[in-house]
Amino acid sequence: MRRPVVMGNWKLNGSKAMVTELLTGLNAELEGVEGVDVAVAPPALYIDLAERLIAEGGNKIILGAQNTDLNNSGAFTGDMSPEMLKDFGATHIIIGHSERREYHNESDEFIAKKFNFLKENGLTPVFCIGESEAQNEAGETEAVCARQINAVIDTYGVEALNGAIIAYEPIWAIGTGKAATAEDAQRIHASIRALIAAKDEAVAAQVIIQYGGSVKPENAEAYFSQPDIDGALVGGASLDAKSFAAIAKAAAAAKA
C-alpha cells in the first residue's frame, strides 16, 4: 500500500517567530502519529531555522522547499540549487506550482527539466499539475493534466516518476475556499494513474498522487477515503499546527 504524504506549502508566509511557533506546535501535535509522512516547505530564508526545529522535535517532519534552479552553482543571481537544499536537509521540492507557471512563466518543458535535475541530485520532486477554471468548465481537465505529465514522460521516460510525488491541484481551488468534490478529485486521480499505467503499471501502482486545493480538516477524510488520493499538498491550513496535524492524522487513519 502507498504511504500517504501530507505536505504544507507555506508559500510567501513566515517570520522567525511564526516558524518557531508553528513547528514547535506541529512537533507536539504529531507525537505518536504513524502511518503518514508529513512534510513542510517553508520560504527559503527559513529553511535553516526549520531544519533546526525539526531536529529538536525528533525529526518527525520532512523538510522541503518551494523551488529549485537548474544549476548547482554559478552566476545565477537569486536562485538556489539542489546541492544547497541538500546541505540543509531538504528532500521534497515543489515544482510546477500554478503560481510559478503563471507569475514566472514556467513552461511544461522547463518544469520537466527541473523534475529531472532534482532526480539527478537524489531529491524528491513534488510535481504540481492542474487546470484553470476555464479549462475545467470546458471539460479539458484530463487533457491538461496529461499534457503536463507527458512533458516529463516523453522526455525522460515513465520510469522517471518512480519515487516522485504528483500533486493534482485544480487552479480554481487554490486559496479560494472552493474545492473539488472528493468524487471529482478521485476521477482525475484515477485518470492520472491510468495514463501512467498505460506506459508502466508498476510505476503507476507506486506513484504518490496528492490532492491540493482548499484541503481542510473538515474535508480531509472525504478525500483520503478515495483509493487514488494518497495525501495532500496543503496551503493555508498548513500555517496552523492543529489544522495541519488534523489533516495528517486523517490521512493516517484513512490509509491504515
Curated annotation (Swiss-Prot):
Residues engaged in binding substrate: N9, W10, K11, G175, S214, G235, G236
Subunit details: Homodimer.
Family per similarity comment: Belongs to the triosephosphate isomerase family.
Active site (UniProt): H97, E169
EC code: 5.3.1.1
InterPro entries (UniProt xref): Aldolase_TIM, TIM_sf, TrioseP_Isoase_bac/euk, Triosephosphate_isomerase, Triosephosphate_isomerase_AS
Role description: Involved in the gluconeogenesis. Catalyzes stereospecifically the conversion of dihydroxyacetone phosphate (DHAP) to D-glyceraldehyde-3-phosphate (G3P).
GO annotation, biological process: gluconeogenesis; glyceraldehyde-3-phosphate biosynthetic process; glycerol catabolic process; glycolytic process
Keyword tags: Cytoplasm, Gluconeogenesis, Glycolysis, Isomerase
PROSITE patterns associated with the record: TIM_1, TIM_2
Entry's Gene Ontology cellular component terms: cytosol
UniProt pathway annotation: Carbohydrate biosynthesis; gluconeogenesis; Carbohydrate degradation; glycolysis; D-glyceraldehyde 3-phosphate from glycerone phosphate: step 1/1
Listed PANTHER family: TRIOSEPHOSPHATE ISOMERASE
Species annotation: Vibrio parahaemolyticus serotype O3:K6 (strain RIMD 2210633)
Name under which the protein is recorded: Triosephosphate isomerase
Name of the gene this protein is made from: tpiA
Catalytic activity line of the entry: D-glyceraldehyde 3-phosphate = dihydroxyacetone phosphate
Keyword Aminoacyl-tRNA synthetase among UniProt keywords: no
A single MF term (Gene Ontology): triose-phosphate isomerase activity
Localization annotation: Cytoplasm
Broad enzyme group: isomerase
